[in-house]
Each structure stands twice: as C-alpha cells, then as structure tokens.
A protein has these predicted regions:
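Short aromatic-enriched loop/helix-cap "lid" or pocket-rim segments at secondary-structure transitions
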Residues: 71-73, 88-89, 145-150, 217-223
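A short glycine-rich, Lys/Arg-flanked "PGG" loop and its adjoining helix->strand segment in the class I
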Residues: 118-133
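A C-terminal cap/extension of S-adenosyl-L-methionine-dependent methyltransferases
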Residues: 43, 198-262
C-alpha cells in the first residue's frame, strides 16, 4: 500500500513508490497536502455540494484523490482511475449501481471531462432516488473567467461544441481530456436548461448559481503557487457572498448546478 501525503502540517514523504498510480493524481495529492488555501476552498465546495443534497447516501463521481472524504468519510467515491480512497473504479457513463440507490450524487470539476454529458445525466438520474439531487461545481465561462481560462488554463475552451451530440466513445481517451465550456453550454441560460429537461425528462434543473469570484483564482488551484494565505480564504468567501447575483454572473469562475430527480 502507498502512504500518500496527508493534509496535516507539512508534506509527508511517501514511504513507498507510487508506481501504478496516475502521476497527475499523485502530484495533485502532494499539492493538496501543502496548500492550506486550497483545502479551505475545497472544504467549502464540499459543504455546498452536500447542502444541496437530501440527507442519506451520497455518491461522489470523479473522486480523483478522494479528498472529499476529509469532509464526509461515508461518501461512496467513484473514479475511472484507481487511487487510495476510491471505492469503485468505473466509467461515469456506465455506473455499476442498481436503480434508485442514492439520495445524492456530487461532482466537482467532472462534467466537463465527460465525452457524453447527456448520457451521463441519464445515468445519474437512474441511480438517484426520486427526490434525490445531482449537485455539480464546474468551470463557468463568464466575462472575466473565460479570458483567464483561454489564456492561462491548460484545459481547452470550445464554445462551439455541441454537448448534446452523440460522439463515439474512445476507449483510449485520456481521462483528463476536457472542454471547460460544456457546463456553461448546458446550463448557463434558461433555454439550455429547458432543453436539458426535455432531453432527460426525469431531471429538473433546480438551481444554477455563480460563485468563486476572488479566492479561487487567487489560490492557483492545484498549481504550486498561491496568492492568498489559507487564513484569508474564509473572510474572502464571506465577501464574495455579498456580491449581487447580476455582478457575480460576470465575475464568477465556477458555477453550482443542482438537478433534482422527479
């Protein structure tokens, strides 16, 4: 077993080789252990995801390095790649669970990596109990954020893509391939949300909110640098919550999307 860095104080050196693990995930776990600001931000993301789900069983899709379990250990974490803390290795398009088993499904930066997002939404609906919720936090292509993502982020942004298209599944596809525009194309407007509900009639779009204005971009995410100390994340998030919604829609780097199973 590989002992990975823990988010307590300084980085703990791995006691064994991480051979067999995806090296990008190993690096992410190392950055997670070092950056207090990153952990503070993601714990707040986790809180928001859980608050938008009913009480009960929760499935975390695209769990990555399983950091969500620091917020809630009983969550079932699934990912297409194996990693310590991941309970189920599975493709999000074909979940290995029976119908109507979970009260909530949560995802953080996952939808924009999926080849067939509509197929996934149908699969999420299948495993949700009636009244259950799918809560997602994803990149938002707002006035400010899109310029940042276009220039500085390694993942591409293609606003001309058709997220409803039936593309062939590529078995050799890199699971980190992405189009950061997908969540915005699917949920940023009322007509887009109506099309989702028509295409997946068992789901209703409950909320689409815009957040992550200042603290998240200043943290550097999973990059090694940060422009904000961990102690300032809480006060800055409190300030962000006071920004009026019409302004947030132009400044936000992320969007919270909640769909409910009917």
């Amino acid at each position: 077993m590989v002992r990975l860095p823990q988010a307590q104080g300084h980085l703990i050196v791995m006691t064994q080789s991480a051979i067999g693990l995806n090296q990008r995930q190993v690096i992410h776990r190392q950055v997670w252990a070092r950056k207090k600001a990153l952990r503070a931000l993601y714990h707040d993301f986790h809180r928001q995801l859980f608050e938008n789900c009913p009480a009960g069983s929760v499935l975390d899709i695209g769990g990555g390095t399983a950091h969500i379990k620091e917020s809630r250990p009983d969550v079932v974490s699934a990912d297409i790649l194996s990693f310590p803390g991941i309970d189920v290795v599975a493709d999000a398009h074909r979940l290995p669970f029976r119908n109507e088993i979970f009260d909530g499904v949560v995802m953080l930066d996952v939808l924009h990596h999926l080849e067939r997002p509509i197929e996934f939404l149908k699969e999420a609906s299948r495993v949700l109990k009636p009244g259950g919720c799918l809560a997602m936090i994803e990149p938002a292509m707002t006035t400010i954020a899109r310029r940042f993502y276009d220039r500085f982020h390694e993942e591409p942004v293609d606003m001309n893509a058709d997220p409803f298209a039936l593309v062939a599944i590529d078995p050799d596809r890199d699971p980190f391939d992405a189009n950061q525009a997908i969540p915005t194309l699917l949920f940023a407007t009322a007509p887009a949300c109506r099309r989702i509900e028509q295409t997946v009639p068992s789901l209703r779009v409950r909320t689409v909110e815009w957040h992550s204005l200042f603290a998240y971009p200043m943290s550097g995410g999973f990059q090694k640098w940060s422009l904000i100390p961990g102690s300032l994340v809480g006060p800055m998030l409190a300030l962000e919550r006071k920004v009026p919604a019409p302004v947030r829609k132009h400044l936000a780097f992320r969007m919270m999307i909640v769909l409910q199973r009917i």
